[in-house]
Amino acid sequence: MDREEISRFSAELMNMLIQGSIGLSTIQGIELGFFDWIPHNKPITAQELAVQLGYDLGKVERWLRFAAVYGYISRSDGGYTLTTKGMLLRRGTPTPDLLGLHHMFSYFTKAIQHSKDAYLKGVGLDSITHGTISRDYIPRVASQLSKASVAFFQRAGLSTGHTILDLGCGDGSVLREIAKTLPGISATGVDMNIHTLELGKRKNIEMGLQDQIDLQAGDVTNMSRFPENAFDWVYAFNVFHFLPVNKREKFIREMLRISRYGIFFNQVIANSVQTLSVDVLLATLFTDYTGFFSETEADEIIRRVSAQHYAFMPVIQGESRLVSIYTVTHDLPLTRVADLPVDQRNLLQAKDIRTAKGLLTASPSLLTEIGLDSETVRKPVIRALFP
């Protein structure tokens, strides 16, 4: 073996392990509750933290030393406070998808411990543990990863008074976010996991949303009970990698059939070493996992169902893209959108954007390039197209 290659690859592999240990120590802090218990505005000592949580003082001090060096906490007045960086990993974080990813990796560590059983038996850890993983994973991981999509729905056209169906809703966390953001929404969720549905129903009651959100048990691949245009919007997040590849196109077409205005779904694309590694670990976790899209498959399925617009999600950019397909049958020339200022319309027409759908499917970067705020210019079009 070449000595230079040995040296280079050894350094690379060592760095990978070091980064892995940082991630594991961070996940340990989340699991132990440190990020939730350390205040951001009032110092707490290691002794106080150990007593409050019932933990060994020496181990708490070791974790605090790590957290201080990595920037999660800062030392002041004889104690520790949480930094902005650390606050992103506590409950109520403004970036729930980030917290969800950390929880996801905590499950991956469990999957690794049972790799031999999963590989020999051809099943996932969820089967080996009789469904325990699935029950816990959805509220802690999947629900957190889904919340970031609510802003995209609004940008695409979802408004107060509309109806929406969430296929593979888990505990309904996304629907609760939608209901909080847009009062008056009528929401329905369908999922096969009875445990998470019951958890979601309890949360709906706690928040007074039980009359606004209807959670139903059912097979998300069977939409025959819903008539055409049954809902204004239909949505599926992190569902496709649990569907057989040969059923994915039909699933999208059924979503299109039962939607009045449009559909949303995401495609996780195995286009990097990160997603390829996650693909391996999810297959170890779940028996019914069928895999991410290749880039070619993702593009081809959108082409076959005539998707008009797609956009990338903010956190896992380039690896998970959220797609919107408009099913509303009519369109409007921009000249008939009453609240759209003439000067803005002229700028759009100069870029050959002449209809409401044309504006909604235009690249946000293009709108910025011609001096228009994407959110502002879309609002009158959304009101006109989706009453």
Predicted features and spans:
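N-terminal accessory segments
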Residues: 1-110
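Conserved beta-strand signature within the Rossmann-like core of class I S-adenosyl-L-methionine
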Residues: 260-268
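Compact, charge-rich alpha-helical regulatory domains located at protein termini
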Residues: 330-387
